[in-house]
Amino acid sequence: APDYGLNLNRLDIPVNPYEVFKCDVPNMSTLLYFVVNDAFYNKALPKAQLPEGVLLGSLKDLSQQHPELVQQYYGKLADTSKDGITAFNTAFAQDGFMLYVPKGVVIEKPIQLVNILRADVNFMVSRRLLVVLEEGAQARLLVCDHAMDDVNFLSTQVVEVFAAENSVLD
């Protein structure tokens, strides 16, 4: 079996996905964001303004900036006692992506999240996606997964989606 590395020391992965990667969806204009391996790429972000109150970005950063909000949802749907992969992901996930849309807020433009696997050696990635839409909120989220290198990747991803009454997530 391959020996997979895990980026526990949070070494920087040298890539600017906005310069080297295109994931075009025909006839759709999106707000484009990236997760490189397991880390939200925040060195360059779309210029578009999100509606007031919307939180979008690194799960790690948002858990530090809004701990009460993240604690309210993180790990509430992902049952680690019944699923070994979910338990593994929960133990090793260090970052990922979070989208929070407050009550009644509508994000007009679709959000495109591209998960990129990038490494020079066999690599293991555990990332988490957390999406929360409060009552009456609306968003469209397109998630794409791509590998940039010709090495073996072992990836786990757990997605938790909370959609309150009358909210819409496409």
Predicted regions and their residues:
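Glycine-rich and polybasic anion-binding loops at the starts of cofactor/ligand-binding domains
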Residues: A1-D170
